[in-house]
Amino acid sequence: MWDLREKFERDGFVVVENVFNDQEIDEMKKSISKIVNDMDLAEHPKSVFSTYDEDKHAADSYFLNSSDKIRFFFEEGAVDKDGELTVPKDKALNKIGHGLHFLDPTFEKMTFNSKIQNIFKEIGYQEPGVVQSMYIFKQPKIGGAVTDHVDSTFLRVDPIDHLTGVWIAIDEASVENGCLSFIPGSHKDTSSANYRFVRTHDTSGGALLKFIGTRPTYDQSKFQHVPISKGSLILIHGLVVHKSEANTSEKSRHAYTIHVMERKNTKWSEQNWLQETENYKFPDLYKD
């Protein structure tokens, strides 16, 4: 991995091939299947996740309070106007978040894995803390697009470049099923981070979250598709611009993602939607 850091610093992302073997991928799939099968729909609001609707999560305490829980977010195309599912629940989910990495033994094992630890040592992280995890389904036919964005819009640290995402392909990710696309080198322009998703701290029944600043626009011709094989991962700088198209294929595009901050000499913004709780302090990625 001698050139991993060089590519990461140049492009703002880097593909690391074949990090997880078939057995490990199968373990994660089986674990998520059990979590979904055990979910009682009556106990969870059918919260629809959308990157297009800026007001969607504004009053959604179910989302806001999910940092130390395993919670379920549905595809727009899977819930009808009466709030009923139009497909089986295992085909209806957009994602599960945001505490899989410490609440589920399988995902904890895969997160605090020597292979992940070595990657972060390679890019120079000294005190990495895992702030969140998500399992993303990108369902066949209804898996929604994720609009162009930078992760630092949603998770802000100071210094601003002390945040990195890890995107693990549970299925092969191709152009057909909605692989990620990036603008190489876009992490060097910090102006994208002026647009932020923040807590309002409102206690009067108003919006709990809001976007501030002007939403940036990007030259769509600069995006490059980055297809990757099952078991490989993409390391994603917090300021690199990326997106994914809708999955209109017959194939699923599952992924497991985590976000990691360099805690050394770094401040976590009190405005971030995701915060530590009494039950959850960002765990050390390098823990034994």
UniProtKB/Swiss-Prot annotation:
Keywords: Dioxygenase, Iron, Metal-binding, Oxidoreductase
Key word Transferase present: no
The protein's required cofactors: Fe cation
Keyword Metal-binding: yes
Chain residues that bind Fe cation: H149, D151, H242
Enzyme Commission number(s) of this protein: 1.-.-.-
Entry superkingdom: Eukaryota
Single GO molecular function: metal ion binding
Annotated positions binding 2-oxoglutarate: K95, M134, H149, V150, D151, W167, S244, R253
Homology family: Belongs to the PhyH family. PHYHD1 subfamily.
Cited function: Has alpha-ketoglutarate-dependent dioxygenase activity. Does not show detectable activity towards fatty acid CoA thioesters. Is not expected to be active with phytanoyl CoA.
Protein name: Phytanoyl-CoA dioxygenase domain-containing protein 1 homolog
